Structures are given as structure tokens and as C-alpha cells.
């Protein structure tokens, strides 16, 4: 396919993800005030933990009330504990313990653990209107795990005279760090073009610091210069969605490699995991 537009670059990335275990979710399903995809959270819990969900329905006197009460518990936990904690440790509603993510078991011998891991719902959302302060503002791509936004990406294509520098500038100037999706939900933000990737874990207007997320000119772990290895077909940055965002790798990264120290989130560089 001839890639001539930013939207085509975006579509190509999405197409790869959808062919490898991700789902496409509608931007309209996002609750801006809560900062979640509520129905996806409920569907994940129903699929992975049917008994606890039935307990919640019984204790709250019906499914509609259980849904409302449980989502409030999730939002409160995200607001007070943070996304990583909520993904890694259960939330409790009316004495019922519920997990919001399952990580890969050490072996495949436990059928129930494997089934729960496979129930994780990874979603990609394009052009998400996320902002309460500026409803017209939209993000090129948002990655979601079981209804919780975990990463954003701004995608640029040099063929439209835009590159990774423009993506970083967009984060610095056009994105409000106080919007809930940035201040209390997502963990990392990627600026991406076909040749280079940069990332940051914290938006702070002009003070935002981006770090390179490239492999190096000779590939990860090899001596070379900045950038990425040359390719004859495809994109030099395809490792981002083919390897980093690969379903098992992404869940492993969320489960083991991201660290939170106070208000600081430590996200590993490409060569560190």
C-alpha cells in the first residue's frame, strides 16, 4: 500500500494490531468525566470473573446498580491508587475482590489462569475526543487495557511535511496536561513517524521532556548511531507496534517493567526490556 497520508499511517498501524489480538473500539464509548471505557470494564469482568460479578449483582440488588456502583469503585481506585496499581492489584466492592487485569501465568498448566489471561481485552481507539476542557481536541491513537486507557500516540508522516518533532510539539502545545486522560489514566505518550519514536511519561506543556525510543542505527543492543536500522519495505518504526505493542509483550511490560515512584512513572527505554 502506498502510504501518503497521516491517516493511512495510522490505519496501517491499527490494521497490524487488529490482526494480532487487539480490538477496535469506538471513540464514543469513552467516558470523559470518568476517564474509562466503562462497558469494556464490565465485559472483561463478566468474561474473566463471572462468580464475583454474580456476587456483585446479588449484593447490589440488580445488574444495573452493580454496574454503576462497581464502575464508581474502579474510578475511585484509579484516582487514588493510579493505573498501574489498579491493573496489578484487585479492587474491592462490597467485600468482593475483582481484578482489572490478569498477567501471564508462569506456566500454561493452570487452565483457569490461562483462561483469565486470555480474557484480557486490548483495545485501540483512533481519533479519541478525550478532553473536557477542549471537546474538539482528539488524540490520534489511544491504547486501552480492559477499559482503562494506558498509552497515547501522536502519529506523523513526513510525506505530509510532518515528523516526530511535530508530534512532540503537538503534545507540548496542544494537549492540556490537566485533562484526566493525561493526569490520571495513561502512563506513556509516544511521538511517532515512520523513522523515529520518542516517548514521555509526563506532559508539562513546554517543559515536557521526551526521550528517544529508537533501536539505534544497527538495532537494539548493537553499537551504532541514533535512529533505527534502514529497511527496504515497511517502516523503520514498525518495531513499536510489532514488538512493543505486541499483546503478550505489552501486558508483560505493564505487569513487570513500569515503575511508579510518587508522581514519577519510569517507563523502560526500548533496549532496557
Predicted regions and their residues:
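ATP-dependent helicase/translocase motor core
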Residues: 2-273
